[in-house]
Curated annotation (Swiss-Prot):
One of its GO terms (cellular component) is cytosol. It is an enzyme of class 6 (ligase). This is DNA ligase. It comes from Anaplasma marginale (strain Florida). PROSITE patterns: BRCT, DNA_LIGASE_N1. Signal peptide: none annotated. The gene is ligA.
Amino acid sequence: MLEQARRRLAGLNAKLRHHDMLYHGLDAPEVTDHQYDLLVQEKKRLLDEFPDIRQYDDYADVVGTPKIDSRFPKVQHLEPMLSLENAFTVQDVEKFITRVRRFLELQPDDILELSCELKMDGMSFSALYHGGKLTRVATRGNGHFGEDITTNAMVLRGLPHQLDSAPEVLEVRGEIYMHHEDFEKLRGSCNFANPRNAAAGSIRQLNQKIVEERNLSYVAYSAVNSTFATQQEILKQLDEWGFHTNKQVLFTDKIEEAIAFYNSVYTTRSALGYDIDGVVYKVNSINFQKLLGATGKSPRWAIAHKFPSTEARTKLLDITVQVGRTGVVTPIAELEPINIGGVMVSRASLHNLNEIERKDVRIGDLVIVKRAGEVIPQVVDVDKTLRSSGTQKFVFPSHCPSCGSKLHREPGEVALRCVAELSCKAQALERVKHFVSRDGLNIMGLGAKQIEFFCNHGLIGSIADIFSLEEKLHGINLDTEHGWGEKSVANLIAAIRNSATVRLSNFIFALGIRFIGVGAAKLIAEHYRSYKNWHQAMLALTETHDTVQIRGLGEKSISSLKAFFSVQGNLEVLESLSAKLNILDEASPAQRGSSAISGKTVVFTGTLESMSRTEAKLQAESLGAKVANSVSANTWLLVAGSNPGSKHEKALSLNVRVIDEQTWVKMVEDARS
């Protein structure tokens, strides 16, 4: 179950990255906010149910992704524009109320009033007023920074440009959307999938006249930096200032009334003339809101009760299998394409062999497919009443479809997996992505597309091949390939060279061993201190029935280490890597905490003779220091090599201590002794 959850988490993160890039980076979202939020909600439920997989979460606390190559200036919000936590059932709402009451330490007879408001399916914005005058309008962006769309927002119907008796600084938030009628008029000339996409794309037009012609609407729902006592007062004042507000709102202290409001809205929403995707419940008291605060990405005082997911029936054309990074072999339903909730679906998850057998899924069946925040949709049922005699039972392969290794099922697990790990080509692509990730070797410029390119062209077959790439590229002219140029190739080679010096904990994590996330890798590295010690201990572990004790590490992690070192192909890759990398020793927690530079800011400048800049940086960080790229008043130490440049002059002017490379080496040795 844990491996399934980890695989699901990786898929959810991949999907979230994909949609964040489409929405925030390319202005071309494929899904609605509703569909995106379902992905976020499923991820939250998954992490709540399997807390042990949090260490594998490489896309945490995400609100959005900064827009690339933006045509609009980036601006900062007064306070972060966080996304809302989602509820899909009455039980979810009840749990939210319970959490809020517990957090506020309310007694059973204490009143907790809610504001129940429609959740618009549009694009969030903030409007900033100084002295009552509208000075800036911005998109939500990544929650902290958004795009300045002031010029275009000036033509939004009914958006006040001047407020009477407003606070000196006020930030009003709301949603830009498009009515169905206006969307239908637009559909003939523009290729937008739905009103939400049309609103998001229209407000980002470079031509203000086009924005005005699109007839966009908005609704305001909150005010930041205000002195109001309740959300009810905020909505009333927004209305008096002339903002468009949604009049379909309920204030109640009874959860039954809130749910009844939700049900009423759900059944009558088609008559609204615009899209909504749920009801938002907010704690009405602003004082309570301030006490509740927020998590990394969601306020604790609000939740979005989302409308049910959609299902559809289609034909199962075939069942294929795919091998993931950790070797799990997953069956995939190949479907007759069907439109579910505005998205064309042609593939769906069948989860595992047990699920196929339990549901008696056969090729040729009519299956029920559900989209409810899945990475890919899932097959939830089979319509056996229409089963024909020509359907076929699926035979799950006994060997890996990629490398031919015999598939293995571990006790207590339902997933079949290929245990070849580092030597299985199907796993190579995802393993290389993991290897170069931020918490691994952190190779900038070697992203998913570049890795896929090199794998498809036979230049990378395993993680060790990364460090032979420079040699292989000598005989290849990448300038003729799309997306490559002389500068990008040079930058990639430089990044690979820099990554050849790596801290032991990062190296262990980068290998992608099952159950060894960032935290576990650090525990292992701190226990053995050097690559040589760790390698020898693991080889000894495979030759005995004994086990090892590493503080904080569980049985599954130890067993996984033993299994990893029992595969000859893995040992060969390790031998190749250790010959090409400079794997730095890991400092103990005691060393980091007690070192003279712990918590201090260090800057390096000039050319170092005995080590690379990367190695020096890792040395400093391993001893608890913060490494900065520039000198400031907060800099504690400047390490100057030959030809130090302007940083040296600035350090002297700020009375920052300056030492040479030899003194730095001695300082590191003393800290580690």
